[in-house]
């Protein structure tokens, strides 16, 4: 690895190719022999579900995309994967849907051709659609039996008014219940978003760039560009603190979510990076609050802060699971006091440097296989369509000062931007 590359957060040599139809290809040769990881990222997630009554369709298509084509019906698709010893799966997020497969390099052309067919020629009947829509309802009901899933759903519904981040990737229950009746709309959704200009192909592993480029051009080059652009509703400014409570119908430990409207993803501005560092400095296992609440006082058995990357402004959230319902208010006040301390004074420089070093080291350790490299790139290309955004983001981390963290806390972690949600079960 060249010395210059070794200093980058994402140190791998890669090729980025844009095809005339809008498709982007990112090829990352690695030193892991014989294995290839293929990620196909579609920049359509629950954020794109802009029509009232139509939430949940991005996630539904994570299911529908495995229902086959005329050339590769489901049983043939599975047989090809089995013969190749391939592992295939998918996931849906707010901002994108990703389909991923890992296999031996000798099967690359076979898998790439089959994937090109399902992205361009997906075919399913209304009966098949209804069956899959009902399966999604079953998945929602299963998730709804989990307290943290319900807490998360209520938090988003309470915090957001207009933006599509108001609903989770599963969608609103009433929309999921109506989903079996939306066959024609499903065809429209696929036609809008499963287009080359929304799609990035990531290939990482034992490959040659020229051969990958040739095969992608062969099987994906004729895919026709679309024209649809969603109008994502803008979230109005929050005018004051919000609260909600989720009564849980059975015994469970109480949960607490303390959230604030934060910034959108940026690999140039400092605020998002500063809040990422604050989340770790204030709430990781090495933090004073974690040591106090979890280790010494043992009032909490789970404490974490997160500042997820999203295309649009999202939520900085502190999550806590509390052992005794009588301590919920105490834990809430301790969390708020910790956040207030970041607004009032800069984080100690030594603490900030330790956090930066830990995050950089942890990221480097995570890039330990072709699959993990492709998976990481997939998360970031959904935001900026290039792996270079990783290097830019970590350059921003390196420039963050204690005063930058304090300024971001003062700007975003304020009462007027706050939403608190609690969940408490019935008494044992």
Question: Which sequence ranges carry the predicted segments?
Answer:
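Charge-rich, well-structured scaffold segments of protease-associated domains
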Residues: 18, 76-228, 296-428
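M16/MPP (pitrilysin/insulinase) zinc-metallopeptidase core fold and M16-derived inactive scaffolds
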Residues: 38-102, 167-171, 283-299
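Short strand-connecting beta-turns/loops that link adjacent beta-strands
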Residues: 30-34, 195, 251-252
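His/Glu-based metal-binding/catalytic segments typifying zinc-dependent metallopeptidases
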Residues: 41, 228-288, 396
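Short, surface-exposed beta-strand/loop micro-motifs that present aromatic residues
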Residues: 15-16, 24-30, 187-192, 240-248, ...
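Mature N-terminal segment immediately following signal peptide/propeptide cleavage
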Residues: 7-40
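Beta-strand elements of well-folded, non-transmembrane domains
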Residues: 42-46, 262-264, 322-324
């Amino acid at each position: 690895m060249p010395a210059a590359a070794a200093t980058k957060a994402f140190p791998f040599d890669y090729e980025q190719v844009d095809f005339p139809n809008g498709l982007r290809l990112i090829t990352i040769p690695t030193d892991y022999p014989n294995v290839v990881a293929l990620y196909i990222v579609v920049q359509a997630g629950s954020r794109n579900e802009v029509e009232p009554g139509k939430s949940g369709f991005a996630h539904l298509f994570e299911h529908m995309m495995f229902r086959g084509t005329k050339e590769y019906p489901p049983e043939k698709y599975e047989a090809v994967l089995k013969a190749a010893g391939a592992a295939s799966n998918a996931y849906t997020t707010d901002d994108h849907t990703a389909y991923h497969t890992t296999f031996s390099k000798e099967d690359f052309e076979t898998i790439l051709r089959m994937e090109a067919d399902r992205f361009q020629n997906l075919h399913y009947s209304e009966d098949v659609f209804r069956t899959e829509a009902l399966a999604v309802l079953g998945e929602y009901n299963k998730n709804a039996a989990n307290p943290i899933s319900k807490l998360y759903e209520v938090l988003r519904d309470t915090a957001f008014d207009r933006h599509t981040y108001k609903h989770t990737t599963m969608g609103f229950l009433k929309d999921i219940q109506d989903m079996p009746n939306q066959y024609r709309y499903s065809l429209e959704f696929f036609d809008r978003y499963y287009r080359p200009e929304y799609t990035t192909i990531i290939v990482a592993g034992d490959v040659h760039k020229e051969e990958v480029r040739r095969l992608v051009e062969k099987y994906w080059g004729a895919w026709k560009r679309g024209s649809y652009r969603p109008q994502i509703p803008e979230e109005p400014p929050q005018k004051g603190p919000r609260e909600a409570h989720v009564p849980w119908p059975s015994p469970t430990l109480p949960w607490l979510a303390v959230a604030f409207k934060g910034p959108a993803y940026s690999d140039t501005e400092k605020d998002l990076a500063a809040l990422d560092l604050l989340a770790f400095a204030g709430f990781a296992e090495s933090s004073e609050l974690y040591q106090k609440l979890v280790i010494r006082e043992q009032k909490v058995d789970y404490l974490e802060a997160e500042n997820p990357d999203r295309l649009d402004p999202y939520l900085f959230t502190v999550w806590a699971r509390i052992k005794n319902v009588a301590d919920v208010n105490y834990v809430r006040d301790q969390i708020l006091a910790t956040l207030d301390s970041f607004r009032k004074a800069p984080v100690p420089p030594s603490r900030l440097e330790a956090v930066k070093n830990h995050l950089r080291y942890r990221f480097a350790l995570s890039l330990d296989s072709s699959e993990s490299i492709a998976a990481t790139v997939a998360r970031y290309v959904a935001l900026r369509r290039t792996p270079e955004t990783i290097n830019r983001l970590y350059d921003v981390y390196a420039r963050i000062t204690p005063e930058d963290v304090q300024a971001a806390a003062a700007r975003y972690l304020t009462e007027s931007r706050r939403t608190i949600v609690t969940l408490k079960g019935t008494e044992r």
